[in-house]
Amino acid sequence: MKRAKILLLAIITLLPLVLISCGGATQTTGGWSGPIVEDGIIYAGTRDGRVVAVNVSSRKLEWEWPDTTGLRSLIYTTPIVHGDLVYVGTYSGQVYALTLDRGAERWVYPRTGSIGAVVGRPVVVNETIYVASSDGTVYALDATYGDLKWKCELEAGKLWTSPTVMGDTLYVSTLDGHIYDLSLETEGLLGWSFEAEAGFASSPVVYEDDIYVGSFDRYLYAIEIGSNASMWKFPQQKPAGNWFWASPIVNEGIVYAGCLDGRLCAIEARTGEKLWEFDAGSPIVSSPVLMDTLLIITDESGTVCVFDVSTESQDEAVPLRTVSIGASVRSSFCAQNGLVYIRGEDNSIYVVDIEIGEIVEGWPVSLAAQT
């Protein structure tokens, strides 16, 4: 436990430096909010603390929040669209609900003050928005009005990851190396927790009865829910070259995990056996995305790689296509209908057609504002 506390202090101290120079880059870091696409509109947080809504077809800026006179805060959370609202958490410690059509502020929680930095993306389930905050508390807010339904204070210190909801249970991983389960019905801890020797870098991913999560000790953990011991840690022989910062994804019994050492690994979910790996040559900060049988990753250098996971791979995978957007990428991205939407660290939005392997759109957010 003492080692975990020492590692936690080191992580909090070094993390801003890692985010600024994840792969040797020298830019000043802003938020790492990624884009989402809903009904032909891209919603994204920008490096300068705005939320923008941009029409994909016309590149027209539909709205931005706050306006040029508003107070801005760093935005690390990717927006969420639910009903007629878009939700976003800020590093200054508020959660905002904005109208889809105009970006008008519907509500803010808390009304005054701060709940501590919101770094992990909130989730919305059954008209409730769940927020993990750096004050060590999970908040449940009414999605329509922003009223507090309940909150649960953990003995975990900072929460910088996104909560995961499966059924009537919420799971959250912490910077001090715990995973907790909370009941959405009784609005409190269920009693099980898992403790590792280092903090968890990624949000927990639930697949069947197991949790998969990356740690600052440079291992990826597989944990059976309810157990106090891990099923396996990956790599099996020695730690990886860096952190498993991005959350993995699991599909048909295979875990796909990107690492800051630049490697993408396919791992057998039950045994932890490595099936294949790919060396991107640059840190993988964003979680992979699966579209049908195509697995998509971006690395910090701005290269998009596409793999066909329906084919057998031996030891080292070879991507079907690679495309460089020419800008570094540290935020999540989204994919739909054969297109990948990326927000670069140059504050531009890129659209990549993965079928032809080309950038079909790319424009600065500032240009959209002038259109």
Question: How would you label these PLM feature ranges?
Answer:
Residues 1-9:
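Bacterial N-terminal signal peptides that target proteins for export
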Residues 9-18:
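Bacterial N-terminal signal peptides
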Residues 22-38, 64-80, 105-125, 148-166, ...:
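Extracytoplasmic beta-rich repeat domains
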Residues 46, 90, 133, 174-175, ...:
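Structural signature of WD-repeat beta-propellers
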Residues 49, 93, 136, 177-178, ...:
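Short coil/turn segments within WD40 beta-propeller repeats
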Residues 55-59, 99-103, 142-146, 183-187, ...:
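Short loop/turn segments that connect beta-strands within beta-propeller blades
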